[in-house]
């Protein structure tokens, strides 16, 4: 549709300059190689095709996480959110997980959502760790605000990382009181939780860049239902 670019200049929020996230490869528990790379805006329509069926799965609050993630990615695609980014995990080209967040300012980051489309392999945990790696090591932020919407998210983020509770502080997503990750906490947790190798072998990177393959909806539902791994 045609755009009134003069009006768009008013409607589009400020965007901070963000260095790219360098891709890496993670060996999953089943021996498969997951390429973690940064999405570009043009990837959003393909990513949304994987997120959409998850919106109707109640297990572990997949419905609310997926619905919010869908809206956040669409807002990024339509230039309606400030300084958002998205990282994704691919196995043999298939999209198996998505994480996103944004910069509140140059010092403070907002963690948005973590969605594992293939369960039982710690894909969500690996992608969350990659997201924190991006905020702390590459964006050089002083803190990342995090809130959980599910019990498993609380265990994976707040407990595993020993996050600091921020009494009286409301995360952008609403919900419970926000927690934060600081560089000190990140580097303390990094040896246990942040994994992956760089550079990605050329054949694996080429396969990931070639296409974002979306699994059929019934297969996505089966994966989230607890059947291990692609």
Feature roles, as predicted:
Residues 47-55, 131, 135:
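Hydrophobic alpha-helical core bundles mediating ligand binding, dimerization, or RNAP-core interactions
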Residues 147, 162-182:
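Conserved catalytic-core motifs of GNAT/GCN5-like acyltransferases
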Residues 38-41, 51-109, 113-116:
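A conserved beta-strand-loop-helix scaffold within acyl/acetyltransferase catalytic domains
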Residues 1-42, 196, 202-230:
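Conserved N-terminal entry element of GNAT/NAT acetyltransferase domains
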Residues 121-136:
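Conserved acetyl-CoA-binding loop-helix of GNAT-fold acetyltransferases
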Residues 84, 139-141:
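Short, high-confidence coil segments that cap the C-terminus of an alpha-helix
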Residues 87-89, 133-136, 154, 173-176:
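Catalytic cores of nucleotide-enabled group-transfer and carboxylate-activating enzymes in metabolic
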Residues 144-159:
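Conserved beta-strand-loop-alpha-helix junction that forms the acyl-donor binding cleft
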């Amino acid at each position: 549709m045609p755009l009134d670019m003069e009006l768009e200049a008013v409607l589009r929020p400020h965007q901070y300059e963000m260095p790219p996230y360098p891709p890496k490869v993670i060996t999953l528990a089943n021996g498969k190689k997951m390429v973690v790379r940064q999405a570009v805006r043009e990837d959003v329509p393909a990513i949304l095709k994987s997120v959409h069926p998850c919106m109707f799965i109640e297990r572990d609050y997949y419905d609310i996480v997926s619905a919010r993630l869908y809206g956040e990615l669409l807002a990024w695609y339509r230039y309606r959110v400030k300084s958002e980014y998205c990282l994704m995990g691919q196995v043999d080209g298939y999209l198996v997980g998505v994480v996103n967040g944004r910069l509140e300012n140059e010092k403070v980051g907002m963690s948005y959502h973590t969605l594992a489309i293939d369960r039982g392999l710690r894909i969500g945990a690996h992608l969350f760790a990659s997201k924190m790696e991006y905020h702390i090591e590459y964006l050089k932020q002083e803190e990342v605000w995090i809130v959980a919407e599910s019990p498993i998210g609380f265990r994976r983020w707040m407990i595993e990382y020993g996050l600091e509770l921020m009494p009286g502080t409301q995360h952008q997503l609403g919900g419970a009181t926000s927690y934060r990750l600081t560089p000190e906490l990140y580097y303390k947790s990094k040896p246990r939780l942040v994994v992956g190798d760089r550079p990605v072998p050329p054949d694996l990177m080429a396969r990931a860049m070639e296409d974002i393959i979306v699994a059929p909806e019934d297969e996505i539902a089966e994966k989230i239902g607890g059947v291990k791994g692609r």
